[in-house]
Structures are given as C-alpha cells and as structure tokens.
Amino acid sequence: MESIEQQLTELRTTLRHHEYLYHVMDAPEIPDAEYDRLMRELRELETKHPELITPDSPTQRVGAAPLAAFSQIRHEVPMLSLDNVFDEESFLAFNKRVQDRLKSNEKVTWCCELKLDGLAVSILYENGVLVSAATRGDGTTGEDITSNVRTIRAIPLKLHGENIPARLEVRGEVFLPQAGFEKINEDARRTGGKVFANPRNAAAGSLRQLDPRITAKRPLTFFCYGVGVLEGGELPDTHLGRLLQFKKWGLPVSDRVTLCESAEEVLAFYHKVEEDRPTLGFDIDGVVIKVNSLAQQEQLGFVARAPRWAVAFKFPAQEQMTFVRDVEFQVGRTGAITPVARLEPVHVAGVLVSNATLHNADEIERLGLRIGDKVVIRRAGDVIPQVVNVVLSERPEDTREVVFPTHCPVCGSDVERVEGEAVARCTGGLICGAQRKESLKHFVSRRAMDVDGMGDKIIDQLVEKEYVHTPADLFKLTAGKLTGLERMGPKSAQNVVNALEKAKETTFARFLYALGIREVGEATAAGLAAYFGTLEALEAASIEELQKVPDVGIVVASHVHNFFAEESNRNVISELLAEGVHWPEPIVINAEEIDSPFAGKTVVLTGSLSQMSRDDAKARLVELGAKVAGSVSKKTDLVIAGEAAGSKLAKAQELGIEVIDETEMLRLLGS
C-alpha cells in the first residue's frame, strides 16, 4: 500500500503534467472534470496532513511556467485562481463560511458573472493608454502578449472618459465565440491546417502566436472582470461599480453581470445561465460568484491560491473519458463518408453518449486514434458529441488501426476523395440506398418541404421496400400503400397523405433548399430565390451570373450550375411540378422605389438579437429592399451585430464595412 507521501508525490506529478499541457502547450489530455477531481483529492490529503504541504504543490500556485519563446512580465499583483464548487450544497457551505468569517450582521450582496472558458489576461493602461498585456502564466509571471492583444478589436488601445487612473491593470478573459471557432476549424480542415479541439484551445493558440498578424485574423474578443494594479486614481467601492466604471471607459463587460441579494437569488442566477448556455454563442463552464463589497473582500482576504470572497460554481462536466469500441462509417445524402466512434457508454452533461463523430480521415489521423483507445468526449449544447483527444498516456496494448473504406459500406461503389477536399464520398449517387434515404429525409424536413408526420423510420421503410426512389415518388403515395408499413395504421397513413398534399404549397426558397444542392443552405437558397425570382431564370443562369448573388462564390455557383445541368435532376424537378408542387409568383421589389436606409444594400446579421427573432429581422429588412446575406464579403454594405457577435463582426471591421448594433437597427427599421 502506498504511503501518504507517495500518494501526494504521485498526485502532484500528475497535476503538474496536466497543468503544463493545459496552460503552456494548449493541448489538454484530460477533461477539466478529471483535473478538478485530482485537485480535490490532493487538497483533501493536504488538509488531513498539513505538515506535508510543499511550496511548489499545485494547490499553492496557479497555471504553469511561461513558454520560453515569449518574453516574460512579472505581475505586480499575483493573478490568483478561484476555488470551485460543483453543487448547491457546496455553494451554500461557501456562503455560510463567508457569513461566519465576517462575524457581523452586515448583509452580503453577491456579484455574479459568467465563467468564460478562455484565457485569463492582464492589461496595463498608463494614463489611459495600453502599454502591456500578459497571460496568467504561473500567477506570478506571465508571457508578454502585448502585440497580440493590440490586435483584438474589443480591447481599446486608449481609454476614454474622465478620472482615468495613472496606472490601471485590468484583468479579464480573452475568448473565441463559437461561430469563429467553427470557421477556423472549417478553414483548417479545408487547407490541412491545425484543427482545434474546442474554442478555449483555439483562443489560447490564437493569442499565443509569435506572429501578431495571425492573431489579428482570428475573431478573438474579451470581457473584463477585475483589477490588478491601481495607482493615481480611484474606483468605486463595489465590484459591480468597478465593472460599470470600466464600461464607461470603453472596456467590454458582459451584460449578464447580475447583483444578487441572497444565496437563493444566486442559485436562481446559476440555473438561468445554465438554461441559456446553449444560446450564448460562446463557451462558459459555470458562473463566478463574488462578494460585491470591496471592504468585505478585504476582511475576508485570501488563501494560498485563491480569494476567500469568490468562488466558481461550475456546471456539470461537458467532457468525460471513455473507450472507443469500434469505428463505423455512415453515408450522408451527398455521399459523404463519415466515420463514427462507437463508445463505451458514458454520461456527458446529463446525457448518455455511446457515439461520437470523427468527421473524416484527416481528423482520425490528427487525433492518432486507434480502436480501443481511451479518449476524451465533449458534448456542448446541442452539438453532436465529438472525440476531443486520445489519452495516449493510457493507451492499451491491444489497440487496432482504423482503416478507411475504399468502397461504400452500403452499396459497394468506389469511394472517391477529390484533391483539396477533406471529405471522401461514395460515387453511387441515388443507386446508393443510404444517399437516397438521407436525401429524402432532408427533402421532407421542417425547414425544407415540412411534411408533418413523415419521420426517419417511415423514409427508411419506404426506401427499403422500393416504394420511393425520388422525391416526386413521395407525392404518389396512397394511404393504402402507407398502411402496409410498420406501426402505420389507416388514420396515421391518411394524416401523412394529407401532410404531403399540404406540403405541395411551398415557397421557391424552401423548394430550392429541399432539393439538397451541395453547399446550398437556407440562407443561400433564400438569396438565389430572391435574386432570380423564377425557377426558369435560375436554371438558365451561368456560373458568372450565379456569383452576383450575395454569399455565392465560385464553389457554390459551380455546385448550383452543375445540379441544374444534370438531366436526372431536371427530370425530378419536372415530376415534382407535375405532382402539383407550386409556390406564389415572385413579388418584385424595386429597391429604388423604396424610401429606406436599407434599400439596395447587402446586409449581414451576426450575433444574437434580443428584441426580435432573426427570421423576423430578415423579413423586415427584405421588405425594406435589403438583400440579406449569410456571410461577410467585399459585397457587404452593412453588418448588424447583436450580442456575442463573432467572426463576421471581425471580418467586417477588417474590411472597413459599416457596423451597427441592434438598437440602431430597430431605430432605422422604425424610421
């Protein structure tokens, strides 16, 4: 049996290894929850045996040593970490400790913030001018990232307003909105660049570039949450007051900061944020709860690595470790072959996960994944679970290589990978049962033709029984034929037939989206429908003319042109129209005749809107003569930026495109 000293040494060595991977290499090997568990185990042992605590124990310091490639900045005031709680009982115990330590009847008010999942930084302003910036590093010394921080547009290079201190060190989190993270990885997969496991790693990797020009291209943003150095000036005597003052000076502060008068209000805030988490547009892993009064903070003081007046209340882990039992290959509606990891079932963020996407062959190679490996699984919001990384230090001896198929696992056709593309595809087309099934499921989906009651299992049976080969065949189905399907009685069958009849009346945009043309999503379909107005005009369009549509480049234009050039596709469209599929005649909007500040402009919406839905905003803009695009380009005239706007806002600023916020949009809509 190991001695206490051996257990402590082993735990400290393991934690230091993972701290180095997380803080220095930006390549964590284990989930945060596993790190937290190890840290709790170490802290509990040290609490029982305080005589064995060493000055270099992970419980006594923060982070890891800085990279040698950066010069170093010593923090004048140490950048400490926060203690964590993981459930209501632990938070209430923390609340009681605070009340007991203050030993007074004075009320405690809590300032609650989002716990952003990014990289902690300190930014020093002298006479209102940004002079330096550093990472947290080991809490005492960080890396000099001044040049990179200066490229982040959310961070002012000069504060504005009155009574700015002579020296002010602001602390906060640099992070990457989810939209920006997805765009970076999408570009990386296309070009063979580095794919990041999550937004936190992407933010850290972007901020710690030796070339600031690379950082400048990444849509990083920033929220401040505290103060380090303060000289030659004053700040309010509450934490919230300080954040509001920062905002007046031009520093970005989250609008979700909330003052809570009791522990019950704090718990309500925690649960509301947890509920809103999937819609925020950026990653958080909990909430931070701080005593609002600076005087009370001073009374409470600090322990070795954290303040006694604050705590991080973390959400259930979104990452867990498990084993890959097998890798199977699925075929999508465009023939894309997607590897899927079959996992030893594990609960992640409250959901039992047994499968995770592996994206493509490049991703398997990047991960170095083998069947039998121990892996970290991540599930965030509604995102499909994915393998974040392989725990190489715990690789079993009997793992097997993952062999990507050369023939379709469904129809046996050749698998082809076009040069420059990450995706391998089955060449079978509609002779492939899997492609046929997925194409039909897309066609009847809610945002396409919206056939109520026609679920995936019905489509599967229709294809397997050879009742349906093309979308047009769906409209030839009778209640009698449907009744022969599993779990389909006469009433249900008639309901499906009625839903198919109702679906015949649609819109041109929905119809185009339902056809499943490669790279044509809802926004692009709407843009094509608005620009060409009729099916005949779209079918006759050249690749050059297609590129005049907002959001349509050479790749999408080629896919659209090739789709309509294919005789079998034109035949399916003719059959659909013959079965009665139709849509209203286009209403031609002449922008020149509309008296509106949006008339004739190409507009892009980004971030979340609070006063109206995105669909309502799009519809209103189109009514006023705007063309609404899905991405920012040189053709864009105006960007409307809501909360947590990401890469689109950064690109607009880079291109010098006019940007307005939601308040200004509403004013102009009403003018």
UniProtKB/Swiss-Prot annotation:
Pfam families given in the database record: BRCT, DNA_ligase_aden, DNA_ligase_OB, DNA_ligase_ZBD, HHH_2, HHH_5, Nlig-Ia
Keyword Transcription tagged: no
Highest taxon listed in the record's lineage: Bacteria
Keywords: DNA damage, DNA repair, DNA replication, Ligase, Magnesium, Manganese, Metal-binding, NAD, Zinc
Domain BRCT as annotated: residue spans: 593-671
InterPro entries: BRCT_dom, BRCT_dom_sf, DisA/LigA_HHH, DNA_ligase, DNA_ligase_AS, DNA_ligase_CS, DNAligase_adenylation, DNAligase_N
GO cellular component, one term: cytosol
GO molecular-function terms, A-Z: DNA binding; DNA ligase (NAD+) activity; metal ion binding
Annotated Zn(2+) binding sites: C408, C411, C426, C432
Cofactor(s) the protein requires to work: Mg(2+); Mn(2+)
Intrachain S-S bonds: none
Catalytic activity: NAD(+) + (deoxyribonucleotide)n-3'-hydroxyl + 5'-phospho-(deoxyribonucleotide)m = (deoxyribonucleotide)n+m + AMP + beta-nicotinamide D-nucleotide
Gene3D superfamilies reported for this sequence: 5' to 3' exonuclease, C-terminal subdomain, 6.20.10.30, BRCT domain, DNA ligase/mRNA capping enzyme, Helix hairpin bin, Nucleic acid-binding proteins
EC number: 6.5.1.2
Active-site residues, as the UniProt record annotates them: K115
Binding site for NAD(+): D32, A33, E34, Y35, D36, S81, L82, E113, R136, E173, K290, K314
Keyword hit for Signal: no
GO biological process, one term: DNA repair
Matching NCBIfam families: dnlj, PRK07956.1
Similarity comment: Belongs to the NAD-dependent DNA ligase family. LigA subfamily.
Function: DNA ligase that catalyzes the formation of phosphodiester linkages between 5'-phosphoryl and 3'-hydroxyl groups in double-stranded DNA using NAD as a coenzyme and as the energy source for the reaction. It is essential for DNA replication and repair of damaged DNA.
Protein name: DNA ligase
The encoding gene: ligA
